Structures are given as structure tokens and as C-alpha cells.
Amino acid sequence: MKGMRSLGFAVVAVGLLAAACNDSESYSTPAGTPYDPSKPVEFYTFEPDSGGMRTKCIIKGSNFGTDIENIKVLFNGDREARIISSNGNMIYCLVPKQAAGNNKVSVVIGKDTVHSEKTFAYSVKELVTTVVGKNNEEGYVNGSLGEARLGWISGLALVTGNNLIISERNFFRVRLAALEENQVITLMEGSQYGKPAVTKDRKTAYFIGYGSPHTIYKFEQDNLWQPRRVVSSIPGFDGIIQCAAFGPNEEWLYFRDNTGKFGRLNLEDPGIVEVLNEHCGDTPNATDSHLIWHPQMECFLMSLEFAHGIYKVSLDGKNVEIFAGFNGIGGQDGYLNEAQFTSPMGMAIDRDGNIYVAQVQNHIIRKISYPDGLVSTIAGYNGQSGAVDGVPYKSRFNGPWDIIIDDEENFYIGQFWGSSVRKLSIE
């Protein structure tokens, strides 16, 4: 019976795959029964009952309809599956990324929502790989992703086309790594830049010059990622600026220099520059800092390299509060008031509000769970540098300086001394 059941599932899958036309999974409406709002939607079962991200799944029931624009399949409450096709009684979909565990599955057809009695056992796979350059081999070489050699990475941006824009501190260059085309090229030479601000559509990245006069360049998809100067200087800011950031919208570009001055520049009228706070956070040893807007908390998070902690900063810059760290140097995990950080730098935030921090001096990646504030080490080993790929707890990094997140919530990590880009895949 078990073999017959598996065979039946395979036949159904083949039929629905055929309806989806081709390997690219583009959709065309298959023959089937349209949705009838006068009848109930029924959810019988689904197969398989376990797997990971992108597992092919068949949902069985009745009155689903054939219009995939009117169908949603949700795992674990709010994780939406990609719908490939439906014949009215069976939906073919791809399992979305979600938390590990036994998760509920729901089908939404128009205004009707139905739930399965059984759960889907989702398993998470985690892996660290090197995607650009060679670990601990600094240099200047363009070419394929593996042949390319990079300098000390001080900023990363993920833009459209699955392209990475990379700034190099020591070589005064901005590079582009085309992940799909397997190619690395140089976009600009002669200036130092840190982490850019990237628009939500990922079509534009703004870089602020590291040192005064802080020339701002933008790199746009419409201009084939070639640099265009926005302004030649930011008046009133004489210290080093490591990071540019957007707030809740893209009207203003925010930044903080290493004298502690926090401000913003209006992108519609770049002549408008405002100093929001003259003394934003501690400034030990003229430290570098990173900024990122946290949408759920509705504030900036600001990491300070040699203060070994992270601040919360209000949008107007007036309220600055300790958020995490400032408990001495170390890698102790725990809640916000007890965890230790060593030189936190680049930060990324996932859709649930969890915060990921690259720690350059002790070579690890940390996670701050939102909203409970639990700090954990998710990759690398405290105080040990290296160049080991593989499962996260066995991986080793060399100066992870920046971290960014893609649309599937995988992470790219730019290494300062390691001179390479690593990828932390969580599926």
C-alpha cells in the first residue's frame, strides 16, 4: 500500500508539473474545476509531510479553483508557499523557508481559510561557503568569482540581478560581483567607501566617502552600475563616515561620523544637510560605526567597533539608548543585559525583526532574537580566525566586517582581513 501511495503521488505530481509547462515553473491555467464561492473549500491532506525549503508539495482537497492568483498556501502561520499550479482539487507548490519544527499548513482561497489536521515537519539546513575570492588571499584580480582577488572588505550591497557591490578599504576600489554571470569587475577606483544605503527595490546604492569631504556616489541599475556623483561634500562633518543608511523611507540619507556627530542629507535637495545630534553615542579610539533601520522597533541600531556594543537611536537622533553589549570584551551569549560583544560592525535584519551582527575582532556572527533579546552565536567560534567552510558551528572567519541579507534570508558576509565574501545559507 505504501508503494502504491507513493506511485499515486508521483503521477499527480507529474500531471501538475506538466500543467506548469516547463522547468522554469512558469504557469499556464490547467484544465480543472473553477472555484465556486457557494461551496465550501475543503483541505484533505498534503504530501510529503516533511522536508525543507523548496520541497515540492501537493495539497489535496476540493474547490481550490485553478486561478493561482486567488490561492495561498501558508506554512507556520504566515510563510507563503510558491504556487505552481492547481486543477481545483490539487495544488502544486514549493515549501517556503520557515522555522524548524512541526508547522501548521493552511489554504486560503479568496476569503475562505482551511487548515490541515496534520503538520509539516520542516528541517533547516545551514551551510557556510565562500562565494567570491579566496579566503586569506588578498589581491586585485578581476575574472570569475573563484579567480577574483579582493582587498579588505568594508561594505557590501546586494542589488538587482543577484549582484554584489563590494567596497575595499585598502585598495580604494568599488567592485561588482555578478553571482549569476560568475564575473567580478571594477566599478570605481581612487576613493575609500564603507557600507552603502540600498533602496528597497535594490536598484540603487548610495556610497558616502570614508574621509572628508565625503563625496557621495550612487550606483544604479539604469546606469549599468556605473558611479554617478550626487554631491561633492557633506558640510559640517569632518570625521570618518563608515556607513550610510535609510530610515523608514528613502527621502533622507543618514550617517554618523567618528566624532559622534549624527546627521542626514536630503536626496531630493542634497544641499539640505541637518546635524541631528552632536554627540551620538560613545567615541572611544575614533571608532567606526554601522547604522541600520529596524522597522519593528522604529529606530536605528548603531554598532560601535571599539565601544563593543550597540545603541538604539531615534529617527530624530535625540534619544540614544544602550541596546546590547557594553559588558566588556568577549563572546558570551545570553540576553541583552548580559551578552558580550567584541567589535560589532555590520548588521542585517530579517523579516521577523531578528538582528544579525558581524563581529570583526573575534570572528563570529551573532543573532539577537526579536523581540525576546536573546543573543546567540550562529557561525564561527569566538576568538578563532580561519577559513573553514561547512556547517556554521565548525566554520571559521577572518574579520567578518559586514553582513547583508537576500530575499530568501540567506546572508552574505564580507571579510576584512579574509578578503573574501562568504555565504551563510539557512534553508
Predicted features, each with a name:
Residues N163-I166, T204-F207, W252-F255, C299-M302, ...:
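Conserved beta-propeller blade signature
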Residues I59, V124-S154, E181-G194, D222-Q242, ...:
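Gly/Pro-rich loop segments of beta-rich domains
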Residues G161, E168-R169, I208-S212, N249, ...:
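Short loop/turn segments immediately following the C-termini of beta-strands
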Residues F172-L176, H214-K218, G260-R264, H308-K312, ...:
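A short loop-to-beta-strand structural motif that recurs across blades of beta-propeller domains
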Residues L158-G161, V198-R202, F246-E250, W293-M297, ...:
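Residue-level detector of Asp-centered blade-edge/turn motifs that repeat once per structural unit
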Residues N22-T66, D112-V124, T129:
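Beta-strand/beta-sandwich contexts
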Residues N398-E427:
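Blade-level signature of beta-propeller repeat domains, shared across WD40, Kelch, NHL, RCC1
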Residues L17-A20:
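C-terminal motif of bacterial Sec signal peptides marking the signal peptidase cleavage site
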